[in-house]
Amino acid sequence: MHCIRSSILQHLRLRVSVRPTSLLQNENGFKSIGIFNFTSEAAADGGQDQILSRVIELVKKYDKTNTSEVTERADFQKDLSLDSLDKTELVMAIEEEFSIEIPDEKADKLTCCGDVATYILSETPTKASES
């Protein structure tokens, strides 16, 4: 998978429009990058829904998907007919959108938008505590 990813990075441009991550100011006056503002407390207040909607919108923008078929549980391979190269491009777009890195072994296990949102949410508190 690493070879495929490297090859894609060298030869292909993604046709997914990704909005830049904005800096958000928290109550202490410090600025932080958007997604890292989510905590487990925010998840209880709808943070997962926000992440899920961002993931779904990103998948809908991918030019090889039928927007009407993209749902939380639509399987990337079975329902959306994405092959391994398409999925690799999609994972790269998700990494860029959320400013995270998804290891290849984890990326292989992400089969739908819901899995991606759950993974992002599970990784966010770890990233926030490292900063």
From Swiss-Prot:
GO terms for molecular function: acyl carrier activity. Signal peptide: none annotated. 4'-phosphopantetheine is transferred from CoA to a specific serine of the apo-ACP-like protein. Residues 49-124 form the Carrier domain. InterPro entries: ACP, ACP-like_sf, PP-bd_ACP. It holds the Pfam family PP-binding. The modification O-(pantetheine 4'-phosphoryl)serine is found at S84. The keyword Zinc does not apply. Residues 1-39 form a transit peptide. Keywords: Electron transport, Fatty acid biosynthesis, Fatty acid metabolism, Lipid biosynthesis, Lipid metabolism, Mitochondrion, Phosphopantetheine, Phosphoprotein, Respiratory chain, Transit peptide, Transport. Gene3D superfamilies: ACP-like. PROSITE patterns: CARRIER. Pathway: Lipid metabolism; fatty acid biosynthesis. The keyword Lipid metabolism applies. GO terms for cellular component: mitochondrion. SUPFAM superfamilies: ACP-like. It is found in: Mitochondrion. It comes from the Eukaryota. Complex I is composed of at least 49 different subunits. HAMAP family: Acyl_carrier. Carrier of the growing fatty acid chain in fatty acid biosynthesis. May be involved in the synthesis of short and medium chain fatty acids. Accessory and non-catalytic subunit of the mitochondrial membrane respiratory chain NADH dehydrogenase (Complex I), which functions in the transfer of electrons from NADH to the respiratory chain. Belongs to the acyl carrier protein (ACP) family. This is Acyl carrier protein 3, mitochondrial. It comes from Arabidopsis thaliana (Mouse-ear cress). The gene is MTACP2.
